[in-house]
UniProtKB/Swiss-Prot annotation:
Name the record gives this protein: Lipoprotein NlpD/LppB homolog
Pfam families, A to Z: LysM, Peptidase_M23
Top-rank taxon, per record: Bacteria
Organism the protein comes from: Pseudomonas aeruginosa (strain ATCC 15692 / DSM 22644 / CIP 104116 / JCM 14847 / LMG 12228 / 1C / PRS 101 / PAO1)
Gene Ontology MF: a single term: metalloendopeptidase activity
Membrane-crossing segments per the record: none
Residue span of region Disordered: 134-168
CDD domains for the chain: LysM, M23_peptidase
Length: 297
């Protein structure tokens, strides 16, 4: 209410007390509170909003913090951390897994309780091996370290038309350590609510190069994570990893060192309904908006 309404209400309350008596002290306190509230309210109903941190940089996805996961064939510590929303270092500490962070089929990865000092292995627990993608032949050095001289052509007119909000993107030189992982049309953006898209989607042509967005080590190459198809995960440092999903064919293997701009896969549609690259950047296990890191287009 405004100050005028507060004064009118105070007059009404005083008249009521003269008629019915009693409760003077209580009503006086109420009147003072109302007047103080009115005088401190911003004019025009303006709402004061703290802009600091109002736009979340990462999807608010809470990591799994209870239960356990039994390691299957093809799993790595990094792929398990990626799947369940953990920072790989924290998950390693929780389970007492020391560098080089090797895990075994049948090992129980704990998400709850206290950090362990010894890795635990499930006993008498049947383990169903997950399908394992055939490991691709490593790219010869002359090819693996090269960067395409010019971007791949835009999607042909016969492909599915992009949405009205689609934005053309072109792979190019790295800026601030990051480069676009593919050329094509930006058809999906990062979102921390609703559909919860934890990265961006780039539509392109079947078989076109998918490039490492920054240098690092391949820590996962396979198809064991539901919803990602043929997936590559690259560890860049102790803080950041990047992921490249829905590929037709993988050109790198786990443990391989890659450089920014190196071809790591061929774009495809595995695990989805159209040819596209799903690209994510994760900071300490949390998805962040790749557009805040990639060069502006």
């Amino acid at each position: 209410m405004d100050k005028g309404e507060g004064l009118r209400l105070a007059a009404t309350l005083r008249q009521w007390t003269r008629l019915y008596g009693g409760c003077h002290l209580l009503l006086g306190a109420v009147v003072c509170s109302l007047l103080a509230a009115c005088s401190s309210s911003p004019p025009g109903g303006v709402k004061v909003v703290d802009r600091n941190g109002s736009a979340p940089a990462a999807a608010r996805r809470t990591p799994v913090t209870s239960g356990q996961y039994i390691v299957r064939r093809g799993d790595t510590l990094y792929s398990i951390a990626f799947r369940f929303g953990w920072d790989w270092k924290a998950l390693a500490a929780r389970n007492g897994i020391a560098p080089p962070y090797t895990i075994q089929v049948g090992q129980a990865i704990q998400f709850g309780g206290r950090a362990s000092t010894q890795p635990s292995v499930a006993k008498n627990t049947p383990v169903v091996a997950a399908p394992v993608a055939t490991k691709p032949t490593p790219v010869p050095p002359a090819v693996s370290t090269s960067v395409p001289a010019k971007p791949a052509p835009a999607p042909a007119s016969t492909t599915t038309p992009p949405s009205s909000g689609a934005t053309p993107v072109v792979a190019g030189p790295a800026v601030g350590g990051w480069a676009w992982p593919a050329s094509g049309t930006l058809i999906g953006r990062f979102a921390s609510n609703g559909s919860l898209n934890k990265g961006i989607d780039i539509a392109g042509q079947l078989g076109q190069p998918v490039l490492a967005a920054s240098g690092g080590t391949v820590v996962y190459a396979g198809s064991g994570l539901r919803g990602y198809g043929e997936l590559v995960i690259i560890k860049h440092n102790e803080t950041y990893v990047s992921a490249y999903g829905h590929n037709r064919r993988l050109l790198v293997r786990e443990g391989q060192q890659v450089k920014v701009g190196q071809s790591i896969a061929e774009m495809g549609s595995t695990g989805t309904d159209r040819v596209k690259l799903h690209f994510e950047i994760r900071r300490q296990g949390k998805p962040v908006d790749p557009l805040q890191y990639l060069p502006r287009r």
